[in-house]
Amino acid sequence: MTLILAAAVPKAARLASPAAATVEFTEWLTPSNPPYPHDPAYTPDGMVWYTGQRANVIGRLDPATGTFKEWTLPTPNSGPHGLTPDKDGNIWYTGNSAGLIGKLDPKTGKITEYKMPDPSARDPHTPIFDTDGMLYFTVQGGNFVGRLNPANGEIVLKQPPTANTRPYGIVRASTGHFYFDQFNSNRIGELDPKTMGIKEYLLPDASARPRRIAIDKHDIVWYGDYARGFLGRLDPKTSKVEEFASPGGANSRPYAIVVTSDDIVWYCETGIDDKNVLVRFDPATKKMQTWAIPSGGQTVRNMVIGKPNELWLAESGNGKIARATIK
């Protein structure tokens, strides 16, 4: 475990904020072989889970003790990608390389797999539950959004109106609708879970490529424009889109993104592989702050919120799980 205090990056070109802040980074090296944590998840008991994509494992970190446990998945080279817990403490994950969704029961170690009913849905990507316990997910290369009923294993797949848009990150609004990035286009999709109908919002710049996505308590959608180096804001009620240049510029590659309960947007710039940057954006002031990730990050692909003032990051290339404590 490595603990580092990091003040905001001091250069004017990298910091536009009324006052510097401090973030405390703590990092743990995962035991996977090879180590490559792709996505993190946080559970109410304080445990941090991750997909060990290249080692074909689901892992768990206990931050209080620094101890790890990993479960090897039954399908070889399944490429675990996204993951999310259910209300009973089971961990659901996408087998991105094997066209499946899996469920791990940590109490028993039992793993159940659900194959996609359509072979073209080859790469399930990001999973998310609704309040009724139904699991929704994106399928990137197959160009689907799907729903899995855990009660009977039934899977429904729906394609967006536009072909080959590569659905990526997905979030749920207070309305119950889901919003997802269409990474191979300048579109954000909206899924109505009752009808499985999909509406698309066209982003103003044709070269925009939204990758990860977040939503605030006002149902405003935030996304990182990976191709152009912008933070984007979409109001689905009006279809209005606003863009904010990322501090690192056009090649900053905004990726992992969350919105905390105080409406602050946090995201990671990944344009320089060994110099990833954590960015804080205040929508009220339109100001940004940045912090260099101590060990470089090596592409932070996703992050989640843990306890108040706490973010959890998966540093894929470093093989590390990181906690960013906001002071």
PLM region spans:
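A short helix->beta-strand "capping" segment at the edge of beta-propeller domains
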Residues: 15-34
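Conserved beta-strand positions in repeat-built beta-propeller and related beta-rich domains
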Residues: 48-54, 91-97, 135-141, 178-184, ...
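Beta-rich, blade/repeat-based domains predominating
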Residues: 33-45, 76-88, 119-132, 162-175, ...
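A short beta-strand motif characteristic of beta-propeller blades
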Residues: 26-30, 69-72, 112-116, 154-160, ...
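Short loop/turn segments that connect beta-strands within beta-propeller blades
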Residues: 62-66, 105-109, 149-153, 192-196, ...
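Bacterial N-terminal signal peptides
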Residues: 1-4
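Blade-level signature of beta-propeller repeat domains, shared across WD40, Kelch, NHL, RCC1
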Residues: 298-327
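A short loop-to-beta-strand structural motif that recurs across blades of beta-propeller domains
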Residues: 57-60, 99-103, 143-147, 187-189, ...
